Regions:
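Membrane-interfacial helix-loop-helix modules of multi-pass inner-membrane proteins that assemble, modify
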Residues: 116-119, 130-153, 179-183, 260-269, ...
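Interfacial loop-to-transmembrane-helix boundary motif in multi-pass membrane proteins
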Residues: 62-70, 88-97, 106-131, 146-148, ...
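A juxtamembrane structural motif centered on a specific transmembrane helix
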Residues: 1-4, 20-25, 368-439
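Interfacial transmembrane-helix termini
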Residues: 5, 23-41, 58-68, 78-99, ...
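Hydrophobic, glycine- and aromatic-enriched re-entrant/interface helices and adjoining loop segments
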Residues: 143-145, 235-329
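Transmembrane alpha-helical segments and their membrane-water interfaces
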Residues: 48-59, 78-127, 159-177, 221-230, ...
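Hydrophobic alpha-helical segments of polytopic membrane proteins
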Residues: 182, 186-205, 209-255
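Loop-to-helix entry and N-terminal half of a specific, functionally important transmembrane alpha helix
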Residues: 343-380, 386
Length: 439
């Protein structure tokens, strides 16, 4: 017990020191013009640390590792976003960070009981259908956004956690087979394939092909888990057909991709520096300009480029903070994903769920970072937690909550124990009241 308290205190101190060090670098090396703006930023960062840590003390759970790591990443992100174009407090990003923390707790509470999720999976299908309808009928001319006054929502971001929950399955569901022609498939796997086809078709219709690799990686991860579950009999015929189909789909996608995608695949960015290659050229120049330690917070020039705080945020961080800080920030996200290896899921459903979450984060991070560095064609995908965007931050927070649920799940017998304890407590309180009345 003492060791756990010591570990908790040490983690809190480390968290504060990290944020204080970054704020010190902003004050020393940054372009602090108005001290009041810097004080607002420092107050928001330290205040968010204190308030969230006090909230975590109010309830008990098996692990706080992911809570601390998420809080650390979000406040680092808030400092980054508040320095682009000058030192100021980015109130919009602060609100996004708070919503991300709230979404994390919601994801944890809603997905920790795998039996409840499995029994109510039909409501997840209904939610995905509603998101499809909202994208088709309510977004602005295939721009993927629903605009309400000064706020905008991207429904496709919320499909990711829903799709991962659809991909997760228990051993019972995988053993329930249906014979279709010469193949034996589980009903759950067949529904998964249908949902995946609808998602891919919708992304193609929305011209949001940058998100397709993320959904594709989640789907492939789910198929792999379904083929390799304990005592599974893997059909070589199904594996061969799946591989051939995958190759044919990739060839067709490469040859029949829309014109704007073809330009990104074949463009010479330096030959077309002020055209289709403008963003990537400026991103590469910014990374080279920043070097290892950066030019200082608020001293960069990439803030003038479109999507500097979302699609090419890695390059913007590299310019102002240096490749060292940008790499450490990404490494912190990777370590957060690796906590699953330290405290692995206790059941197969949560194992599949956490595998899907990890696959989604890794693919999305790879697309953003490699695209900013011109190692792959530019996709316009956000970098989890570090890019601006309320919808993306909420979806990422919910996914972290799913990771936390995998580490500290809630089983049916635990639910029954808690109900009995509450009943005993109510009975004890009622007995005390009756005694007081009698006396």
């Amino acid at each position: 017990m003492y060791k756990n308290k010591l570990s908790y205190s040490g983690t809190v101190i480390l968290l504060f020191l990290t944020h204080l060090t970054m704020l010190g670098l902003v004050f020393i090396r940054g372009s602090v013009v108005a001290p009041l703006d810097f004080l607002k930023l420092a107050g928001a960062v330290i205040g968010l640390d204190i308030i969230y840590l006090l909230i975590t003390l109010a309830y008990k759970q098996m692990t706080y590792t992911l809570d601390f790591m998420l809080l650390g990443i979000l406040n680092i992100s808030l400092i980054f976003q508040s320095c682009f174009g000058g030192i100021h407090l980015s109130v919009k990003h602060l609100i996004s960070c708070v919503m991300c923390l709230a979404a994390c707790e919601a994801g944890f509470l809603l997905t920790r009981n795998h039996e409840w999720i499995r029994k109510n999976k039909k409501y997840i299908y209904i939610l995905i259908l509603l998101l499809f309808i909202s994208i088709i009928f309510f977004t602005d001319n295939q721009k993927k956004w629903i605009t309400i006054g000064s706020f905008s929502i991207q429904p496709s971001e919320f499909i990711k956690p829903c799709f991962i929950l659809v991909c997760a399955a228990s051993i019972v569901e995988l053993h329930e087979k249906l014979k279709i022609g010469f193949f034996y498939l589980s009903k759950d796997s067949l529904i998964l394939c249908i949902v995946a086809l609808f998602i891919f078709a919708l992304q193609w219709w929305c011209h949001d092909l940058g998100s397709l690799p993320t959904f594709g990686m989640i789907f492939l991860c789910a198929l792999f888990c379904r083929f390799c579950y304990p005592k599974a009999k893997i059909s070589k015929r199904i594996v061969a057909i799946a591989c051939i189909a995958g190759i044919l789909i990739l060839i067709a996608a490469w040859n029949f991709a829309p014109e704007y995608v073809q330009k990104r695949l074949h463009v010479d960015i330096w030959a077309d520096r002020y055209g289709d290659g403008y963003q990537q050229c400026e991103a590469l120049i910014g990374i080279a300009k920043g070097g290892w330690l950066g030019v200082g917070a608020g001293n960069g020039s990439l803030y003038k480029i479109f999507a500097h705080d979302s699609d090419i945020v890695f390059a913007t961080i590299c310019e102002e903070w240096g490749l060292l800080y940008a790499s450490l920030s990404v490494l912190l996200i990777l370590i957060m994903l690796m906590t699953v290896l330290m405290n692995p899921p206790k059941n197969y459903y949560h194992a599949m769920m956490t595998a899907g979450v990890t696959a989604a984060f890794l693919m999305q991070m790879s697309l953003n970072i490699f695209g900013s560095c011109n190692l792959i064609p530019f996709t316009g995908v956000t970098l989890p937690f570090l890019s601006t965007g309320g919808s993306s931050m909420m979806a990422c927070g919910f996914l972290v909550g799913m990771l936390k649920a995998g580490q500290s799940p809630l089983f049916q017998h635990e639910v029954m124990k808690r109900k009995k304890q509450k009943q005993k407590q109510k009975a004890a309180k009622a007995a005390q009241k009756s005694r007081r009345v009698n006396t």
